[in-house]
Amino acid sequence: MSDPLNALILSGHMTREHDNEHRSFRQHNQWLTTLLEDTGRFRVRVIEDPRGLGAEIIDKYDVVLVVFEGRDGYHEKATGFGRETDEALLRFVHDRGKGMVWFHGSAAQEDDWGYPEEYNVMRGAKLSVPTGLRPRPWGEAQLDTVEPRHPITEGISARWTVTGDDILTGVELYDGAQVLITTFDDLESYENAPVWPMSHYPVAIPAEGIAALPGMNTDQPLAWINQYGAGRCFTITIGHDIDTFRRIEFIRMFPRGVEWAATGEVTLQGPDRRGERRFLPWPYYNREG
């Protein structure tokens, strides 16, 4: 296997959904680190205070993962990384040809938060309240792998499920983005939900009702990739809880997406669980990706 790719996780300021008395964003950081390093393809470091981070640190890495929301509560405005860090990250991808990964809620960006619009251009999409940002009703979600396949999704199930995840819909795709995974955002699930929207995650319902929400009854992107200048970006909005991390489809897809963002290529095959290897612990790679 090639020399390990150096991955940097930017984390540390999350909403109470991901940092409270029962769970911590550090669990996400640990799961991501374990999943990536167990492939044998990555060496991961985590920074919990990325505001003001400059190119002298960022440029040492091959790929940067964002696990950062910049606010304490859903109702609050986010405070971003700051100008120096924004400029360093944009150059890191666009000019230096490196990669970025936007994980789960970090993909959401409102116009009045102070993040540069260029991050949306990098991601190849916008996920915000005006575009229809909302969580689907809680429960099991059915995911579809988009055809034709990209090497990131080669060999994973055409249809699979996650349970207990925050399924964020309302993505406005930009030209050039390639969708990897979708879910059908069906009206029936909303109408049959015991409570929706939840009080901690308000949604402005149009006068015409839930059916008039943007993107209702359409396939909604949950993972996509985009070329940005000389570099690449991988965005994935699932991953709220450990159940998703245990799905073999996620175990195969996520490290490949990170590898593609870093290099533009996919070499990881996914864990082999045949024979005696079936006894290996999660995430099953044993550094033999």
What are the residue ranges of the model-derived segments?
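Extracellular ligand-binding/catalytic regions of CAZymes and related secreted enzymes
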Residues: 2-4, 31, 189, 198-289
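Alpha-helical scaffolding within the catalytic cores
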Residues: 47-53, 87, 217-223
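Active-site rim elements
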Residues: 19, 105, 136-140, 157, ...
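Short, flexible/disordered intra-domain loops and linkers
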Residues: 16-26, 74-81, 113-115
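Short alpha-beta junction capping motif
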Residues: 9, 58-112, 230
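Aromatic-Pro/Gly-enriched surface loop or interdomain linker
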Residues: 1-61, 266, 272-288
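Solvent-exposed loop/turn segments at secondary-structure junctions
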Residues: 13-16, 50-52, 70-73, 106-110, ...
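An acidic, glycine-rich "communication" segment
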Residues: 102-199, 270-289
